[in-house]
């Protein structure tokens, strides 16, 4: 095992670029106003979506690729762009949102780009930056522009998890260039593009959720998990995580636990969340240690934890008359939504939880079942873990394991998600919706 180092053709400086002083002012309601603007239909049609860790695609054609020297920037800050595979590239900066169903808005284009600076003209949000160079296939580069303003929800993009699985250059924390686990890297650099289409896991594990939240016209702040590692103040009713947020530093976890203690809701629309402890030193991720191996299982603050991989199970609603599954009416089942990875509260440590839903189980099966759990912290914060990493990708029927979902299932997921976000974006849901404990506290 070794550090995943790649010889790169780099343009631009490695150090953050200073920018002239900027003032950005985002008033309440800015997300609604932003999404009233015209979007760009077919904005992503020339970049075929490819799942991360699909390193074989690199044999197909020449591509222009790149990465920023920072995962996120705030007002007045700049991120330097590194171009690989071509001598230069033009970029199109797309902000992801609803935009009357188009999904993104073109903010600006830059010829022969070297950097991006956040200003009043670049609203906070999740961006996909399209690279174009004559004779090369285009790819995306993700970038978050933070707002740090009062908001209904703060969405956290899980870039550390993307990098753990990122096979660009030949090695990830899971396998080496020969595809074998024995040759995997023990550390990986963030100074490299993402494999697949360049967007990491964003287009399937986060984008469908981001677009739905923006459609609801709630005010949203955007961060990455690297921002959480720097222990920021969260000024939102709820923190939202997408479909796959597996890798957490200790500082990240400390921030989340502090926010729950102080009354901020935690909404987890994924599975296998906060499973692995990692260390971030400058722009390098180091090691992978399951938190449960150091007596800090993720269930201590989430109420449930990862237990199964490679499954596909139906979700059976246990509290059909109560929020949030009451939005489904008499329909008490969502087909095939538990998996590929799933969580449970059985056999874990942590606070007492209500089981909102659980997986179906056949008479021949024994042991634990997948669960969606909910509990209220003493602060009044609600912690809801849907416990499956298919939840977000199923919204757009674009899951990476060969799982597909019919139109009814997609609508069910969107209804429940809408109910969760709208309510939890307003208040401490632990006070509003008192959980009915099914599994008591497990010391």
Model-predicted regions and their roles:
Residues 149-153, 215-221, 235-238, 261-266, ...:
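Loop/turn elements at helix/coil->beta-strand transitions in domains of secreted/extracellular proteins
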Residues 274-367:
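An acidic, glycine-rich "communication" segment
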Residues 84-99, 126, 135-233, 431-436:
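Aromatic-Pro/Gly-enriched surface loop or interdomain linker
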Residues 26-63:
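Proline/serine/threonine-rich low-complexity linkers at boundaries of modular beta-sandwich domains
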Residues 1-20:
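Secretory targeting and sorting signals
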Residues 106-109, 115-121, 198-280, 411, ...:
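Helical hinge/lid and interdomain linker segments adjacent to catalytic or ligand-binding clefts
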Residues 213-215, 348-443:
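Extracellular low-complexity, Gly/Ser/Thr-rich intrinsically disordered linkers
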Residues 65-85, 93-142:
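Ligand-binding face of N-terminal immunoglobulin V-set domains in extracellular IgSF glycoproteins
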